[in-house]
C-alpha cells in the first residue's frame, strides 16, 4: 500500500483526505436523519446504505467541483498563506452548505415526507417568508444547530490534520509541472465523472436510484 501511495502526489492525497472528511460527515448527517425518522424507514437494506453513500459521493463530486478544479491547477502556489486560507474557507463554506441541507431535512421530512432539495428553490424565492422560516427553524430545532456546530468543529479538526508545507516558486522541484499536470488531467475528470454518476449521457438522478431501492426508501437515499 505504501508503495502505491508513493506514486500519488502529496497534494492529491490531501485532496482525497479532505473529500473523505466530507463523505464521513455527510454520512453522519444521513444517520442523524435516519435516527429521527426511523419509523418511516423500517425496511432499509444494506444496499440502501451503499447507494446512499454513492449518492453522497456524487453530491461531493458536483458541489466541490470549483474546489478540486482550482486546487489541482499545476501552479506552485499551495505553499503560500493566501492559498491555504482561500481553500480552507471554500472547503468549509461548501461542506457547511451540504451539512445544513441534510440536517434541515431531519425535521422537514416529518412535515412533508420528502427532502428539502425538492422545494429548495421555492423556499428561497419566498423572500421575507424565508427569513421567518429560518428564525422559526433556529428557535424550534436548536438541537440541529448544535449538531451542525459539532460537525463544523470536527471538520475543522480533521482539516487541520491534512495541512502540510508545499512547494512555492522559490522551492519548486524539477518534476513539479509534469507531475501536477498529469494529476490534474487524471483526477479532475475522474471526480467530475463521479459527480455525474458515471459515463452515461444523462447524469445520475434520484430516478436511477429507484432502480436499486424500494420507493418508500427513496427519501433516505
Predicted region positions:
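Transmembrane and membrane-interface helices of multi-pass
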Residues: 2-220
Amino acid at each position: 500500500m505504501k508503495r502505491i501511495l508513493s506514486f500519488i502526489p502529496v497534494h492529491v492525497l490531501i485532496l482525497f483526505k479532505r473529500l473523505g472528511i466530507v463523505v464521513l460527515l455527510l454520512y453522519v448527517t444521513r444517520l442523524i436523519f435516519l435516527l429521527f425518522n426511523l419509523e418511516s424507514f423500517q425496511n432499509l437494506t444494506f444496499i440502501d446504505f451503499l447507494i446512499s453513500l454513492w449518492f453522497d459521493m456524487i453530491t461531493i463530486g458536483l458541489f466541490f467541483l470549483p474546489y478540486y478544479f482550482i486546487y489541482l491547477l499545476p501552479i506552485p502556489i499551495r505553499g503560500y498563506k493566501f492559498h491555504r486560507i482561500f481553500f480552507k474557507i471554500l472547503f468549509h463554506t461548501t461542506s457547511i452548505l451540504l451539512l445544513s441541507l441534510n440536517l434541515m431535512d431531519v425535521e422537514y421530512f416529518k412535515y412533508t415526507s420528502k427532502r428539502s432539495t425538492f422545494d429548495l428553490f421555492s423556499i428561497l424565492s419566498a423572500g421575507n417568508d424565508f427569513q421567518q422560516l429560518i428564525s422559526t427553524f433556529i428557535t424550534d430545532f436548536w438541537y440541529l444547530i448544535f449538531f451542525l456546530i459539532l460537525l463544523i468543529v470536527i471538520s475543522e479538526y480533521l482539516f487541520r490534520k491534512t495541512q502540510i508545507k508545499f512547494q512555492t516558486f522559490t522551492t519548486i522541484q524539477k518534476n513539479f509541472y509534469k507531475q501536477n499536470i498529469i494529476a490534474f488531467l487524471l483526477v479532475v475528470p475522474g471526480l467530475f465523472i463521479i459527480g455525474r454518476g458515471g459515463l452515461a449521457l444523462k447524469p445520475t438522478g434520484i430516478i436511477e436510484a429507484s432502480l436499486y431501492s424500494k420507493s418508500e426508501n427513496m427519501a433516505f437515499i
